[in-house]
UniProtKB/Swiss-Prot annotation:
Name assigned to this protein: ATP phosphoribosyltransferase regulatory subunit
Source organism of the structure: Dehalococcoides mccartyi (strain CBDB1)
Gene Ontology terms, MF aspect: histidine-tRNA ligase activity
InterPro entries: aa-tRNA-synth_II, aa-tRNA-synth_II/BPL/LPL, HisRS-like_core, HisRS/HisZ, HisZ
Lineage of the species this protein comes from: Bacteria, Bacillati, Chloroflexota, Dehalococcoidia, Dehalococcoidales
Function: Required for the first step of histidine biosynthesis. May allow the feedback regulation of ATP phosphoribosyltransferase activity by histidine.
Amino acid sequence: MIARCKGCSDLLPEDMLRFRYIESIFHDSCITWGYEEVRTPMLEYLSLFTSSGTLTPQMLKRVYSFLDWDGWSGERVVLRPDGTIPAARLYIDSLQEMDVARLCYTSSIFRFDETGKKSRENWQLGAELIGVTSPEANAELITLALETLARLGFEDVELRLSHAQLIKAVLAQLEPNADEQHKIFDQLLDGDIALMSRLETEKPELFRTLKLLMENKGTSASFLKNVMAMAGTAGGELEEPLNDFIAGVDVLDKLGVSYQIDLASGKGFEYYTGVIFHLFVNGEHVGGGGRYDKLIPLLGGPDKPAAGFALYLNRLIPMIDAEDMYDMVEEKILIKYQGDNLKNAYEIANLIRECGISAELFYPGVDTAAYGWAVTVKAEDCYEVTDLIEDKTLELKEQSEVIYLLNGEEDA
């Protein structure tokens, strides 16, 4: 038997029903907020992710790349490892005339995992707000993400906030090399004792500030204001990002949005420049995003600020109950026929479909338990309609009578 690739999954009919349900809720939410749907190709040039330094070397090791050969020469391309960077490229290519662009999309993301235990193909629902740099723009995206999850039936969504520039300002005082800063941040998150001991000895004020940020989870702007007050002389480099962070959470406070300030949640801050947020449902990480004001100019575009987020479809699919999708599950009608009545069966099936109802031809082996009604065409003027749930049967002479009945305008 030929097996599927490691780290890849088949989406079965029930999975796809959940997939489309989640996607439709997200799309509907985005449209009502003024976002327009776009789609980027699965293949992008590798240079899109390397020339601007938008992804760390560690991330680039996980991309699927190959040579797009045209006979004499070629350029290396990748299966997109990220959704935001292609969306930024799309804006630069085709939408620069828009001062403010609200874009949304569904895309698959490919990242290599050596073990094959983690998914190598992941589906994301993304939204990008380009051209606005205010804290209100961050709040719009966070609110849109929370609204989508609420409409999907998720309660008590946990919102964790961090700030990329605050992380970078702290790390810059420890290590000037940007690539090394990522390693140090990972060490801090892992509680590296030697590093923390060195920091406490060499930079005691910075150590106290960092310890406060790493060990405490604030739930209001007051927490950040206290951090700034306690930073002392070490707070010089931290003042600007802290003020920006405070401005962002102030807006969320006004909107009544609950959150947790968690500097450690900023892991993976490669191209982010401001507020970073992550969303959790029952401890499962289901989405995240943030501000990336330098990405579009880094890619050769105009100096446009931007922010965005993604919801992780692969993680949301198993969390959706069938009952939540009731409106998506249409009643299905089973069409049977006797003798030489195939043409009549097709006619009545087409009429049913024109009413927006699913009609399927019966074949041996079909499980009738999945259907609410069955229509058996016995003759051109004889239609047997059976309520499979109530086990009631009615004979009708006209196709119009059948449609009238199945539309629920008359009881069987």
